[in-house]
Amino acid sequence: MQEVLEKKSIKNIDFNCDLAQAYGVYKNIQEYELLDYVSSVNVSCGFHAGDPVTIKEAMLRAKEKNVAIGAHIGFNDIQGFGYRPVELKEDELEALVVYQVGAIMSFAKAYGL
């Protein structure tokens, strides 16, 4: 049994958290303390949370700590933090995803991430 466990054991685990879970005057600077403990982050893309300034700050802080960056997409529901039901057609959902991932990619390109 030990031999089987050794062959299937996980050698590395990506310890991940969400960042930029704020917008405007509603800041959450405590979340940046997590950067010392994670290997990657998902940065909110501005629809359920995040705004351009918050997104930029989160990505730059992740870069400082050498933490990998991913996109945390969400529904266009900032008041409900993305938790309320949203009805979308398939092409609308696709556009929503492309738009949000594009925003993160643009920040990454602009700041050399």
Question: Where are the regions a protein language model picked out?
Answer:
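Charge-biased, low-complexity intrinsically disordered regions
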Residues: 4-8, 23, 105-106
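Hydrophobic faces of well-ordered beta-strands that scaffold small-molecule active sites
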Residues: 13-17, 41-43, 69-73
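N-terminal basic/disordered segments at the start of proteins
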Residues: 13-27
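A short alpha/beta connector and helix-capping loop motif
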Residues: 23-55
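Acidic (Asp/Glu)-rich catalytic clusters
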Residues: 32-36, 57-70, 112
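Glycine/small-residue-rich loop that forms an oxyanion/phosphate-binding "nest" at active or ligand-binding sites
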Residues: 78-111
